[in-house]
Amino acid sequence: MSDFGINLDAICDNVKKGQTESRTGSQLSNRSSRRMDFVDDEELSTYFNSKASVTQSDSCSNDLEIKHSIITEAVVCDESAHVSADAIQEKDETVPQMDHRIMKWMLDSHDGVSLNGGINFTKAKSKLKETENEITEMKSKTNLLVNASVGINSNVGAFNPINQTIKTEAVSDMFEDEDIEGCICKNCPYREKYRKLRSKMKNVLIDMINEM
């Protein structure tokens, strides 16, 4: 294993930071160019293994920011165990394990997940077909109510309604039996109000379609 190096100059600079606030660029460059002081890896391991962890009390400064910076530059701490000089190299990456509950969910799932790694889109296709049927039904109902021609103004780049024609014969579909003898709708006092309201709603619908 290669020697474990600690930048002692960086630690000293952090300690002196609270005492001297102003530094010139040449001083900083000189300190950053100093060589690393290497120590024996076995001695370093022995020292750190004799301590539960490296804490703030190991710093000689009362400045919390400097304490944390010294701890960060000195060693990576592990609160649950002793710190070794080669702890970083010995650390293995954690491999996520498949939980039995996840496997059971995949086996019992009815949402289209298959065991072969593929995806079954049967349920999704049926839902899509139902949605398409609903859209088609809505369009057919709209066509019964409105017949609007929408043009595009190439100069402005916006929709420009050219021709709008309302099928007025569809307005009285609720009163289609009003000519039959004994129909109560024939003499309804709200008949005209309903017609006006229905016509107004259709005009609003035409405006909405033209703006889309």
From Swiss-Prot:
Major site of localization recorded for this protein: host cell
Signal sequence annotation: none
Alphabetically ordered keywords of this record: Glycoprotein, Host cytoplasm, Magnesium, Metal-binding, Nucleotide-binding, RNA-binding
InterPro entries in the cross-refs: Rotavirus_A/C_NSP5
Post-translational modification remark: O-glycosylated.
One annotated Gene Ontology cellular component of this protein: host cell cytoplasm
Compartments (UniProt record): Host cytoplasm
Residue numbers binding Mg(2+): 86
Superkingdom of source: Viruses
Pfam families, sorted: Rota_NS26 (PF01525)
Subunit structure: Homodimer. Interacts with VP1. Interacts with VP2. Interacts with NSP2 and NSP6.
Annotated family: Belongs to the rotavirus NSP5 family.
Annotated protein name in UniProt: Non-structural protein 5
Species assigned in the record: Rotavirus C (isolate RVC/Human/United Kingdom/Bristol/1989) (RV-C)
